């Protein structure tokens, strides 16, 4: 991912977020006038996550800490589906904000932004069609 020249030498705070099969590497920079504020995989956040409501979930940690518009966010996300990627980005943003300012931890924890969702796909068991689906039972 190529960063704009203005951001390349800047100090940044990094946070890693994961959810299901998705992993996101988030970097937070001080906002620079005229630069994009929220990029995901070199695209604008609304272009990468076009579904209704995704943007509000993603900027939740920034809104709860009153930093929306005051920091620039760049994200590299891979793996999983749209929802998993969205939630991994949100967790990465929250973790990066804690590195940015430790005093934000309470507000982020209170709103559930620092909690990693532990649910992952259950493995397929032998003798079953899927993790829990059994083959059709036949009496004869």
At which residue positions do the language-model features occur?
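Structured, basic alpha/beta domains of bacterial-type, RNA-associated proteins
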Residues: 2-20, 24, 28-29, 34-78, ...
